Amino acid sequence: EYAIVQPGCYYRDFEPKTLEKNVIFPSYTASRELCALGGMYGNNCAGEKTLKYGKFNEYILSSKVIFTDGNEYIVEPLNRPQLEEKMKLKTFEGEVYRSVWELIQNNGAEIINAKPIVSKNSAGYAIWNVWNAKTQIFDLNQLLVGSQGTLGIVTEMKIRLVPVEPVTAMMVTFLPDLKNLGELVNICKTVNPTSIESFDDYSLTFAFKFFSDFVKQLGLFGGAQLGLRFIPEVFMMMRTGLPKLILMTEVTGNN
């Protein structure tokens, strides 16, 4: 499944349309009610489901981009013969492909060594993702996504969607201190969770303070449902006091 969108499309308008087809773009951000798809492309966005699904660059299939010569080009993954044809072009587009290819070939070791060893990197200019030596695929989108519009102006995106998976379970863990947090997170990751989120005692106090406002937004029925879901946690806090950190691990699908 995929969708073709323009950069000005707000995610809050986009998601309901995908949900009608029981699919979703999983790399949405916490600010999904405010952001547009163009900003998400430029920022190589990620969010609560990134642990399982990854970032925006893993879902871009092709794009239309205006380069500095003022012309619009289709940017999509190319195999080696297609790349060779692009580099033969006596145009600005051909020069772009020749320059990037030359940069990668002449600095291969440095580029590989410069790649951050992290689970999430949205710093931009991920040139190490452009050429895949194993698959022999060259994808300039991997450089453009996350570049904040500095390398070109995106006018259209073709993005991959994934099936919506129902929430199977959520484990809520109360931590009296942070001593074993790292070890606990690694244990939680063994069940292949969709997300692991946390909030501290200050955030919890803030949530209690404005809980009535949340109920107003959800409505009486929605607020009651939310309250019932967290009855066990409320009793736990009554027994043990306010936790230093609450860790929420969500699993979906067949996990």
What are these regions (language model features)?
Residues G182-V185, K189-N255:
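Terminal amphipathic helices with adjacent charged low-complexity linkers/tails
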Residues N79-I137:
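Phosphate/pyrophosphate- and phosphate-bearing ligand-binding catalytic cores of soluble enzymes
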Residues M40-K49, I137-L161:
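Conserved phosphate/anionic-ligand binding catalytic regions in large, soluble enzymes, centered on
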Residues A36, F67-T68, G146:
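Short, acidic, Ser/Thr-enriched surface-loop or helix-capping motifs
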Residues Y11-D13, C35-A36, E72, P81-L83, ...:
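Flexible loop/turn segments at secondary-structure boundaries
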